[in-house]
């Protein structure tokens, strides 16, 4: 065979000459670039390269990556996700002859660490001398291991002591080599001892079995992982695929490895799945409907989109949006149509529960004092009568001598206790008076002997009859000379008020509030009537009552005058009053005296409410303040919903109102009053003043003084501020003076109404009337270079004035309306001409005059209008 040059060999092997020379030097062959290589050297080179590429023929390497996400809390309170990747590499080896032959031939590697191995052998020999038994066992085990390994390597059966030491040295060197680990040799020696005792094969069968099972498990995990990623890749771009949901749910699985320290065990993977999964079928829910509900809220209760509900509504013939309010029955139909179970609840269920959970006492009714309402016309002496009974001077403190709000007084007389309600007499307080009738037992109708039956007297009779309340007629001012009692009795018979003397059921009492005459007879009549009515009430347990009056005190807060109807009202009780609630802090009577409790038919002032309640609201004592707050909030929201529903209700009438809404003027007013009753009365009276042309718009109202907020509102909306028994504070006065706002104070309601009426009159659109002042007949027509056509006319009626508008009549039909351009008699310009005279008339921008036309001259006058 011919030798081959290194250059040709390098080209065949596709490596550089320098790398080839370096590789030859590693197998103890020194060559240069120009040298040749023999066949044997080439074979050795190829064997070496093959052994270098595959140092172990039976080597199995596994690589594995595990990815997971770790949530880390940051100082800002947010979660930060950290991606973690764990990489594992495992190598499996099998000992055989072909693996160890190149190692034994490599002399350079064995000689480098020969000295260290000799030292270790000396140490082992010295230890073996100490105990002979241990030496024998150690020598036997070492000999067996070495012999068996050497049998496989060299296929020789006999080794001497030097060869045994060499094999030990080579094995130790092999341990230090990168291909074998100390751990592997140690396990091999231990397993060989076990197999020697059991006389089995030297292969580590159990160890291999464990490894194989673990490898199979790893292969299954890797296979599942590859399939999972393959499925994700296949379905990633399919947007509307049904399997996307399953893949997404798989993505949500988090793989976590639990690592145990110092435990030689395979890491176990745990799969944590997300709790929520999209339902595959429709879920039927229990939908609770309390009352009226919007489409959006109904959709939220059914856990579906609002568009689905609207689609179902359209299929049922109902058109609406997400803000459309559905009543309870309609919402029930829609929910049941969509397959849900509906649970209906009453709107006032919470209120009913809180009312049931009340201590009503022993249910023993006792006789109570009668509640008497004094009613009648203005200035007929109602307050003076009550004054005399109470022996106080209340009337002098009333503005203008007229009662402005309901006064409740508990009077103890020699004949018994009576509670009086003094309602205002004039028509503005109709609402207050009607509330007074609802809580009263007896009505005392005061009629002035010198004035007779008046409109408010008739109204009082109507209120009393509607409430089925007995009426006692008190004819006042009998001390006056011009009194006519029989005429009053006759007038009252028209309204079915008959005295007992005339065979009727009504008691008539003649009194004089000034002198006190007949007052005792009136009290006797009241108590007699109360005995007939058998007035009784429960005086124990939680109290109930009615708000007679309410106002805001600057130092004490909201104050309500409450008439107790049954039960015992005590300090510290939790009360529910309309939209308001609170705990009673102070109880006072009409004289300002502090009370600890109040029984039936007792009027008291209550402090401690959240806000000022409306007059006429029912007061109820409850147990739980939290529940009382919930009920008050529910009532407020319900009232707001009703108002919004009424505003949104479209009708033909509202449509026409919207069309004509710009055809009227508007008077904007801000009202501040001292008490709630007066505020309501003024508001209702002002609304009654509204007409089709002028509307009263109360943009703000309240109880208490005029504040800076009120002044700012008046400035922004160009409104008038009306103060009834209140004044403006310093900050409000500053804005009012600076902006020149209209602020007016009143103490009598009549003055307020009259001035508002005058202001509304000024807002009325003016009316105009046309008066015909003269007629002229066209007798001839002339042409003028300056004015065009000139009509020669004869004044047949009235006066023709130059500056007034005119109409041209032809056959009694108006053909033109305009104005005069010139008026002359002969050649002189004149301003007017009287009946029976001739004149020349030039008409502006009109040239179609005919002989026989009539020129009508008129004037426009403005007519003053009143409400």
UniProtKB/Swiss-Prot annotation:
- Sorted UniProt keywords: Cytoplasm, GTP-binding, Initiation factor, Nucleotide-binding, Protein biosynthesis
Of which family is this protein a member?
A: Belongs to the TRAFAC class translation factor GTPase superfamily. Classic translation factor GTPase family. IF-2 subfamily.
For this protein, the record's Pfam families field holds:
EF-G_D2, GTP_EFTU, GTP_EFTU_D2, IF-2, IF2_assoc, IF2_N
Residue numbers spanned by region G5 = 512-514
Report the locations given in the UniProt record.
Cytoplasm
Record region (G3):
422-425
Record function comment:
One of the essential components for the initiation of protein synthesis. Protects formylmethionyl-tRNA from spontaneous hydrolysis and promotes its binding to the 30S ribosomal subunits. Also involved in the hydrolysis of GTP during the formation of the 70S ribosomal complex.
Q: Which residues form the tr-type G domain?
A: 367-534
Q: What is this protein called?
A: Translation initiation factor IF-2
Record's HAMAP family? Answer: IF_2_B
Organism, by scientific name, is Buchnera aphidicola subsp. Schizaphis graminum (strain Sg)
Q: Which InterPro entries match?
A: DNA-bd_dom_put_sf, EF-G-like_DII, EFTu-like_2, IF2_assoc_dom_bac, IF2_II, IF2_N, P-loop_NTPase, Small_GTP-bd
From the UniProt entry, list the residue stretches annotated as the region G4. 476-479
Main location class: cytoplasm
> So where does GTP get bound?
376-383, 422-426, 476-479
């Amino acid at each position: 065979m011919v030798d081959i040059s290194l250059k040709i060999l390098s080209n065949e092997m596709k490596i550089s000459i320098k790398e080839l020379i370096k590789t030859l030097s590693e197998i103890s062959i020194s060559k240069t670039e120009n040298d040749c290589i023999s066949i044997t050297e080439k074979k050795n080179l190829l064997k070496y390269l093959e052994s270098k590429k595959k140092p172990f023929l039976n080597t199995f390497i596994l690589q594995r990556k595990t990815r997971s996400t770790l949530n880390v809390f940051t100082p800002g309170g947010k979660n930060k996700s950290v991606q973690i990747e764990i990489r594992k590499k495992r190598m499996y080896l099998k000992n055989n002859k072909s693996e160890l032959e190149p190692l034994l031939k490599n002399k350079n590697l064995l000689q480098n660490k020969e000295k260290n191995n000799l030292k270790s052998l000396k140490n082992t020999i010295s230890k073996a001398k100490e105990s002979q038994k241990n030496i024998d066992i150690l020598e036997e085990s070492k000999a067996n291991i070495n012999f068996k390994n050497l049998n496989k390597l060299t296929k020789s059966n006999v080794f001497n002591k030097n060869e045994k030491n060499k094999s030990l040295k080579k094995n130790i060197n092999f341990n230090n080599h990168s291909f074998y680990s100390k751990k592997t040799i140690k396990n091999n020696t231990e397993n060989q001892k076990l197999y020697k005792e059991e006389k089995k094969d030297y292969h580590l069968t159990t160890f291999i079995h464990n490894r194989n099972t673990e490898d199979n498990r790893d292969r299954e995990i890797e296979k599942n992982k590859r399939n999972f990623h393959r499925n994700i890749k296949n379905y990633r771009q399919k947007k509307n695929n049904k399997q996307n949901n399953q893949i997404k749910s798989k993505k949500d699985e988090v793989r976590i490895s639990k690592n145990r320290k110092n435990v030689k065990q395979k890491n176990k993977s745990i799969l944590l799945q997300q709790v929520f999964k999209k339902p595959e079928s429709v879920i039927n829910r229990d939908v609770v409907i309390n009352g009226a509900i919007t489409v959006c809220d109904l959709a939220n209760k059914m856990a579906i989109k609002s568009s689905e509900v609207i689609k179902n509504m359209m299929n049922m013939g109902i058109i609406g949006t997400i803000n459309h309010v559905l009543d309870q029955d309609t919402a029930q139909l829609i929910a049941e149509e969509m397959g849900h179970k509906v649970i209906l609840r009453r709107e006032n269920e919470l209120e009913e529960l809180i009312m049931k959970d009340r201590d009503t006492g022993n249910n023993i009714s006792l006789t109570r004092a009668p509640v008497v309402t004094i009613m009648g016309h203005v200035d007929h002496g109602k307050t003076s009568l009550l004054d005399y009974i109470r022996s106080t001077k209340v009337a002098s403190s009333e503005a203008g001598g007229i009662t402005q709000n309901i006064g409740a007084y508990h009077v103890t007389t020699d004949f018994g206790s009576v509670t009086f309600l003094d309602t205002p007499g004039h028509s503005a307080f109709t609402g207050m008076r009607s509330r007074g009738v609802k809580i009263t037992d007896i009505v005392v109708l005061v009629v002035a002997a010198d004035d007779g039956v008046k409109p408010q007297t008739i109204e009082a009779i109507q209120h009393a009859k509607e409430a089925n309340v007995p009426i006692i007629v008190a004819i006042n001012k009998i001390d006056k000379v011009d009194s006519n009692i029989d005429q009053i009795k006759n007038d009252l018979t028209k309204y079915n008020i008959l005295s007992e003397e005339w065979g009727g059921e009504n008691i008539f009492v003649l009194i004089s509030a000034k002198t006190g005459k007949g007052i005792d007879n009136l009290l006797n009549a009241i108590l007699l009537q109360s005995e007939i009515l058998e007035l009784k009430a429960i005086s124990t347990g939680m109290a109930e009552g009615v708000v007679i009056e309410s106002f805001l005190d600057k130092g004490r807060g909201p104050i309500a005058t409450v008439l107790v109807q049954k039960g015992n009202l005590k300090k510290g009780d939790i009360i529910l009053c309309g939209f308001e609630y609170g705990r009673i802090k102070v109880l006072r009577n009409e004289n300002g005296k502090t009370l600890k409790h109040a029984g039936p038919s007792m009027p008291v002032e209550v402090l401690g409410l959240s806000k000022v309640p409306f007059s006429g609201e029912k007061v109820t004592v409850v147990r739980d303040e939290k529940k009382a707050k919930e009920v008050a909030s529910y009532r407020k929201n319900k009232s707001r919903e009703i108002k919004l529903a009424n505003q949104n209700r479209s009708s033909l009438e509202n449509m026409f109102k919207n069309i004509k809404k710009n055809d009227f003027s508007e008077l904007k007013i801000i009202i501040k009053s001292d008490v709630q009753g007066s505020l309501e009365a003024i508001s209702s009276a002002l609304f009654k003043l509204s007409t089709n042309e002028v509307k009263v718009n109360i943009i703000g109202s309240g109880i208490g003084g005029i504040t800076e907020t009120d002044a700012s509102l008046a400035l922004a909306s160009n409104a008038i501020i009306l103060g009834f028994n209140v004044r403006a504070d310093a900050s409000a006065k500053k804005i009012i003076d600076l902006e020149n706002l209209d602020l007016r104070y009143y103490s009598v309601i009549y003055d307020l109404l009259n001035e508002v009426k005058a202001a509304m009159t000024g807002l009325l659109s003016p009316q105009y009337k046309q008066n015909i002042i003269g007629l002229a007949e066209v007798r001839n027509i002339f042409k003028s270079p300056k004015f065009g056509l000139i009509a020669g006319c004869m004044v047949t009626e009235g006066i023709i004035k130059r500056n007034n508008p005119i109409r041209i009549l032809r056959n009694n039909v108006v053909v033109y309306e305009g104005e005069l351009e010139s008026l002359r008699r002969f050649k002189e310009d004149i301003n007017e001409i009287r009946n029976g005279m001739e004149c020349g008339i030039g008409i502006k921008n009109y040239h179609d005059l005919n002989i026989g036309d009539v020129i009508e001259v008129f004037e426009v006058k403005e007519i003053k209008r009143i409400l």
